[in-house]
């Protein structure tokens, strides 16, 4: 299949159909045994994994958070980001107000694998991380699956804005 730059493509199918495999192939977690994966006409096997990973942002269904602060977990998408940039990404992901209610704000530690946060809060931190990274290609792997309907609608609006002029799966 082909996804033109700046367009969005929804990949739908039952569990085990290979939806997540597509993102793994894009990231070169493994190479194809047949056929090719091209990004902007270039075979991903001819590019470094680092450059691919810099160009692609993923919001997975099962968010990975580090046993560190909320700020660190958001800024992981762009090391060296300023506090203002981190907070702006958090606002877009609808998590800033929640963070500001915590006793230590952005300095709050999330615990091992983010266990101190709900599924929806972890998901919003992951979305903020990807927004901050500002990649050319977005992969949203059931990115709003852990959110309530109201929050999902708010984040969908933010994701539409972030997806503008980016290739999105």
How does the language model describe each region?
Residues 1-169:
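ABC-type nucleotide-binding domain
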């Amino acid at each position: 299949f082909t996804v033109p730059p700046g367009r969005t493509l929804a990949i739908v199918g039952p569990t085990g159909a290979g939806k997540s495999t597509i993102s793994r192939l894009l990231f070169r977690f493994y190479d194809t045994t047949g056929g090719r994966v091209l990004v902007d006409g270039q075979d991903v096997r001819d590019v470094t994994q680092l450059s691919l990973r810099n160009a692609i942002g993923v919001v997975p269904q099962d968010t990975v958070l580090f046993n560190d602060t909320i700020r660190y977990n958001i800024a992981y998408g762009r090391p060296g980001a300023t506090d203002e940039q981190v907070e702006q990404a958090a606002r877009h992901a609808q998590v800033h107000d929640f963070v500001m209610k915590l006793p230590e704000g952005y300095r709050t530690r999330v615990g091992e694998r983010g266990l101190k946060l709900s599924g929806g809060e972890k998901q919003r931190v992951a979305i903020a991380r990807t927004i901050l990274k500002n990649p050319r290609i977005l992969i949203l792997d059931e990115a709003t699956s852990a959110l309530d309907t109201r929050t999902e609608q708010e984040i969908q609006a933010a994701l539409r804005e972030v997806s503008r002029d980016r290739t999105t799966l």
